[in-house]
Amino acid sequence: MLRAIVVFAPIIAALAWVVFNIQKPAREQFNRDFLGKD
């Protein structure tokens, strides 16, 4: 159990970091496209 946490924690952290960094510019683009028109 502890070994599974040690193995998966860095993987989950890396995935969360990647998703966060992908969504941030995408969300800014979304706001620029949809909220900026009106």
Swiss-Prot record:
Parts of the chain that traverse the membrane: 4-22
InterPro entries: PSII_PsbY (IPR009388)
Domain of life, per lineage: Bacteria
GO biological process, one term: photosynthesis
GO molecular function annotation: manganese ion binding
Record flagged with keyword 4Fe-4S: no
Residues spanning the signal sequence: none
Membrane topology qualifier: Single-pass membrane protein
Family the UniProt entry places it in: Belongs to the PsbY family.
Biological role: Loosely associated component of the core of photosystem II (PSII), it is not always seen in crystals. PSII is a light-driven water plastoquinone oxidoreductase, using light energy to abstract electrons from H(2)O, generating a proton gradient subsequently used for ATP formation.
HAMAP family: PSII_PsbY
The protein's name in its UniProt record: Photosystem II reaction center protein Y
Species name: Prochlorococcus marinus subsp. pastoris (strain CCMP1986 / NIES-2087 / MED4)
